[in-house]
Amino acid sequence: MKITLVFLSLIFFLRCDIIEETNWSFLPPVKNEWESVNTFGGSEEDIANAIILTKDGGFAIIGNTKSTDGDFYFKNREGSDVFLMKFNNLSELQWIKTYGGSDDDRGHGLVQLPDEGYALIGYSKSNDGDASENKGQHDNWVIRTDVKGELLWEKSFGFLGHDHAYNIIKTNDGALFFNGFLDVTASNGLGQNKIFSNSSSRHGVGEFWAHKIDLEGNLLWRNYYGGTSNDRSYDSIETSTGDFILVGTSESQDQDIKNPNGGYDIWVIKIDKNGKLIWEKSIGGTEYDSGTSVMELPSGDFLILGNSFSNNGNILNALGSSDIILSKISSNGEIKEIKNIGTTSFETANSFVRRPDGTLLIVGHSNNESNISDDQMIENDIVLFYTFENGAVIKKNSLGNLGFDSGNDLVHDHNGRLIVVGSMENISEGIVKRDSNKNIFIAIWH
């Protein structure tokens, strides 16, 4: 297997812009450069969606692949399968595993467990191969593996509609918690514990959907949250007090959503350890706004990362057609601060991490719409913003070429390096790719 390592000495490929002048004297040294880029995949679409650090000092990546050649030469099924990649502490690939059936299977989140095996989350439309059951369209799909990625068990959670899951975490009491969305109309109101009073008449085509299961896949509880329109959750955390925060987007203006701003809002909910709704908060305006990631701060406040097309409601300082939004919310659900991050162009964010000094690194993609003519391919670059906790930008870096390139997730390792993963489309000079479809990329920033 050939792994291409490229040191980016090509100045045209790396762009670094100082957005705001900052006194750097109190910050730890940062080289502020891309050290290397690796690409993986075959001749079809391959996408990395999430990354975690592993207990042996390496890292693991989950995503989905349609390839049956290249790095996925051993895959003997057409269509999309979940993949799990493991790397050592030198960023060298150790092994790859795929999981799926004959239909559409996607991997979006992962966590390493005390036995050093993995729990994977995504959604599956298959009922053959590794997927033993499917109840409709896509089902939430949980996969449990050993430390080498060998399948131990898998389980589907879903009903007749499209039910997707995006994030999974290990809870402090040793269980698993995952979230996504449920088509409540298709489930005819099913999808929650009987102790909850929500009825199917109160909910619509998509709801925030949360599950808690044990390490053998047995359901402990589940519940859905939202209104009569489309509501989807993308990320979650367990708080220091044992509750859960879920973030996503909501189109609803009724039921669990009390103060909507119109259009799609960033929607944040807090639920207790048994899944009961504690509070909810809408952030946005009359356009499309969505929450993508959440973290708890040492103060007990929460930072919500999202994207916004709005310039009204409680988002009033739009910079471009789409801005990254950073919101600080108290433990009681009160909005403390909302900050637009971006330029006069188009930026979206998918994930963020907090450095030990309190600064943030935010990854997503951007494009300069003003430089694109009708006959040109849209250039979406991987974008990395380095900011203070309040969202004030220190540096902006971008990486990419023509085509749709996106940074989907990132981790900050023990050596101070940032590892960014996502997808890279079309051939970029200086980077060896297998084809013009999306390939997995792993980029190191320091």
What are these regions (language model features)?
Residues 16-446:
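A sequence-level/structural motif corresponding to short, flexible coil/turn segments enriched
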Residues 4-13:
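Sec-dependent N-terminal signal peptides
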